[in-house]
C-alpha cells in the first residue's frame, strides 16, 4: 500500500488511489499491507476500495478450473466476503489508463484520520470533454456506507454530458447521499 502512496506514476495518474493509500492505517501497516489483501478482506470501510472502484479496476481471479476477469464491483459478496471460490486466488489487479482531461480524488472522514477506520470514504474519477467543463465520464464510489463499497450510479448520471457547475455537483452529491445506507453503530 505504501508504494501506491509514494510512487510518482501513481500520484500522477491515479491521485485518488495515492490519497486513499495515504489515509490507510499507519506507515508500518502500509509498508506490509497489500492491495490484494485489502480487496480480499472486503471490508465495507476499506480505504483503498472506493478509489479502486472509481478507477474502474478489474480483477483476474485464477483457480483450479481456470481464470476469470471481473470488475471489482462484482468481487464483493458482502461484508468481509468475496465471490472467490475455494482454491481461487486474486492473481492480478488491472487499472485502465486514465482518459485525457481527467482527474480523481479520495476523501476520508474518520474521527482520528489515518489511524482510524473510515466513517465515510468517497472517491471520484471525472473526465471532461476536451477544452470544456462538460463531463464525459464520471465514476463515484462510496465506502463505509453499505455492506460493501458501492458505486453511486445515480450521482454519476447527474453529471454525464453536462457542464460541471457548483449546483450540478451539489445535485450529484445529494444523489450519492441517497445511495448511502450506513450502519447505526454509534
PLM region descriptions:
Residues 1-186:
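C-terminal structural segment of proteins
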Amino acid at each position: 500500500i505504501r508504494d501506491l502512496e509514494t510512487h510518482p506514476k501513481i500520484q500522477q495518474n491515479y491521485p485518488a488511489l495515492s490519497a486513499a493509500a495515504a489515509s490507510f492505517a499507519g506507515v508500518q501497516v502500509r509498508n506490509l499491507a497489500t492491495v490484494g489483501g485489502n480487496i480480499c478482506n472486503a471490508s465495507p470501510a476499506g480505504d483503498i476500495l472506493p478509489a479502486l472502484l472509481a478507477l474502474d479496476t478489474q480483477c483476474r481471479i485464477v483457480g483450479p478450473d481456470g481464470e476469470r476477469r471481473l470488475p471489482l464491483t462484482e468481487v464483493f459478496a458482502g461484508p468481509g466476503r468475496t465471490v472467490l471460490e475455494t482454491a481461487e486466488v486474486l492473481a492480478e489487479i488491472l487499472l485502465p489508463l486514465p482518459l485525457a482531461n481527467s482527474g480523481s480524488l479520495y476523501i476520508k472522514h474518520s474521527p482520528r484520520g489515518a489511524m482510524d477506520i473510515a466513517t465515510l470514504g468517497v472517491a471520484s474519477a471525472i473526465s471532461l470533454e476536451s477544452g470544456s467543463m462538460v463531463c464525459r465520464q464520471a465514476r463515484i464510489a462510496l465506502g463505509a456506507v453499505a455492506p460493501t463499497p458501492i458505486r453511486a450510479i445515480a450521482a454519476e448520471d447527474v453529471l454525464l454530458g453536462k457542464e460541471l457547475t457548483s449546483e450540478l455537483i451539489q445535485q450529484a452529491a445529494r444523489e450519492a447521499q441517497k445511495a448511502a445506507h450506513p450502519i447505526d453503530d454509534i
